């Protein structure tokens, strides 16, 4: 029985990056031996155990053989005779197929993962890559994480991803898994690499067609020097990651704010009149299909519908600003206004040449919101107002507070 550290912990250590959870593989043991040593079985589909003291996951070395369509159709063999090399062969990428002996510290790298780390290449381990559609999503997610370190995807890996997209294999992806991977991407440093990897291999069209449809749709060059809406989508996602690191909530709203531009009739290009309204329906359909949590949906729909109003904030009347805050649910969910401001700033700065531009509308929106939020309905009730009178007086008082805050700014 031998124990090896495998996967991300080894990869990240070799990259000099902070390591997350540690995963271990056990060679030459069976389930009875593991339990006799105090390991607690937790794997439903695979022989996985928790260490009796550390609680870390230890899995028996295993092979997997494709037995059906999708990512669940596998036959697992965890016999004690399965070797370390056989276990590593089933893994997705060479950089994840590196093991380190727990006792000696010796590194085992049968598939060239160390070389690929040095050359900054994301490469699949073997032809079994095509058997699991989730690996296409994982490839794109790894690119979102590793692209800032200079990684590129191996041409042969991109070709396999394209083959999987063309074959219809990606249709078997469970929506919840797509959302799980997307949410992890939106907390990464460079979400654009996820989008670009999937788009270039044809996988984005199969997995997230609403996002893929934006590529090739032109915008007015005086407002969008990058022209292509798909490129703008990438730039906005990266800017959101820069402005709100690790905030997938803001990232999702930024990613989906312009879906309506894909619905503009080509004869109207490069203008996109009312795209902020047209984008709500495909956004809601996307959220429904992926079973996106409500807080993500609500902020995304708000940003889609209102981002142009925030851009035009200096032109809006005080009453219109109050109506905007109400539509954004800014009085019941105060945090939403700061989130919306970040999304809109990412939109404005996610354009070629505007990356370092100022966006005064963001702080201004939060300032007038704070002024209006300071008006309390309980104070009005204490003045003897009742029922609808309180609502009317509250709106009037908040509009006056907005006006005062704006006048002080001027």
UniProtKB/Swiss-Prot annotation:
Q: What is its EC number?
A: 2.7.7.72, 3.1.3.-, 3.1.4.-
Superkingdom field = Bacteria
Alphabetized, the UniProt keywords read:
ATP-binding, Hydrolase, Magnesium, Metal-binding, Multifunctional enzyme, Nickel, Nucleotide-binding, Nucleotidyltransferase, RNA repair, RNA-binding, Transferase, tRNA processing
Where do transmembrane segments lie in this chain?
A: none
Q: Which residues form the HD domain?
A: 229-347
Entry's InterPro entries? CCA_bact, HD_domain, NT_sf, PolA_pol_head_dom, PolyA_RNA-bd, tRNA_CCA-adding_enzyme
Which Gene3D superfamilies did the record assign?
Answer: Beta Polymerase, domain 2, cca-adding enzyme, domain 2
Q: Which residues take part in binding ATP?
A: 8, 11, 91, 138, 141
GO biological process, any: tRNA surveillance
Q: Which reaction does it catalyse?
A: a tRNA precursor + 2 CTP + ATP = a tRNA with a 3' CCA end + 3 diphosphate; a tRNA with a 3' CCA end + 2 CTP + ATP = a tRNA with a 3' CCACCA end + 3 diphosphate
Name what cofactor the protein needs: Mg(2+); Ni(2+)
The positions annotated for binding CTP are 8, 11, 91, 138, 141
Key word RNA-binding present: yes
Q: How does it associate, per the subunit comment?
A: Monomer. Can also form homodimers and oligomers.
The free-text function statement in the UniProt record for this protein reads:
Catalyzes the addition and repair of the essential 3'-terminal CCA sequence in tRNAs without using a nucleic acid template. Adds these three nucleotides in the order of C, C, and A to the tRNA nucleotide-73, using CTP and ATP as substrates and producing inorganic pyrophosphate. tRNA 3'-terminal CCA addition is required both for tRNA processing and repair. Also involved in tRNA surveillance by mediating tandem CCA addition to generate a CCACCA at the 3' terminus of unstable tRNAs. While stable tRNAs receive only 3'-terminal CCA, unstable tRNAs are marked with CCACCA and rapidly degraded.
Write the protein's name. Answer: Multifunctional CCA protein
The organism is: Xanthomonas campestris pv. campestris (strain ATCC 33913 / DSM 3586 / NCPPB 528 / LMG 568 / P 25)
What is the gene name?
A: cca
